[in-house]
Amino acid sequence: MAKVESQAGELQEKLIAVNRVSKTVKGGRIMSFTALTVVGDGNGRVGYGYGKAREVPAAIQKAMEQAKRNLSKVELNNGTLHHPVRGVHSGSSVFMKPASQGTGIIAGGAMRAVLEVAGIHNVLAKTYGSTNPINVVRATVDALVQGQSPAQIAAKRGLRVEEILG
């Protein structure tokens, strides 16, 4: 599962997957490792990173650095989403919808780690198609970034928030 580390910058770090890969050359195989990580501040910022190196710790470090560089802002509504969202990347498709207080994170695998570090506490989520962790993480972040608050939608349409909410 995901390994959690806390840091001075108040960013939560989670290691989602480590994979051994090899390159075949004339003299044999060259082994290396890849790492997939997510980081977030637990308050609406989330990023993912993918690192590759000859040793596991170096791959994890590269992935964490990349994740910290790629932070995205997510609009939250009291620990859940404002509206249902769908994200797609390659063969993976994810669907997430807001849940009432006390529901928890109903999601599996790599998607759960992304939602936890983003600061989402109540959500219903489902992965369709490929469950490859890299594609699921990218689709999840894509879906979260698409989410908009009623204030953003009202500004876009030139209306007041009360008119949007009905």
From Swiss-Prot:
Residues 11-74 form the S5 DRBM domain. Disulfide bonds: none annotated. It holds the Pfam family Ribosomal_S5. PROSITE patterns: RIBOSOMAL_S5, S5_DSRBD. GO terms for biological process: translation. One of its GO terms (molecular function) is rRNA binding. The keyword rRNA-binding applies. Transmembrane segments: none annotated. InterPro entries: Ribosomal_Su5_D2-typ_SF, Ribosomal_uS5, Ribosomal_uS5_bac-type, Ribosomal_uS5_C, Ribosomal_uS5_N, Ribosomal_uS5_N_CS, Ribsml_uS5_D2-typ_fold_subgr. GO terms for cellular component: small ribosomal subunit. Keywords: Ribonucleoprotein, Ribosomal protein, RNA-binding, rRNA-binding. HAMAP family: Ribosomal_uS5_B. Belongs to the universal ribosomal protein uS5 family. The N-terminal domain interacts with the head of the 30S subunit; the C-terminal domain interacts with the body and contacts protein S4. The interaction surface between S4 and S5 is involved in control of translational fidelity. With S4 and S12 plays an important role in translational accuracy. Located at the back of the 30S subunit body where it stabilizes the conformation of the head with respect to the body. Part of the 30S ribosomal subunit. Contacts proteins S4 and S8. This is Small ribosomal subunit protein uS5.
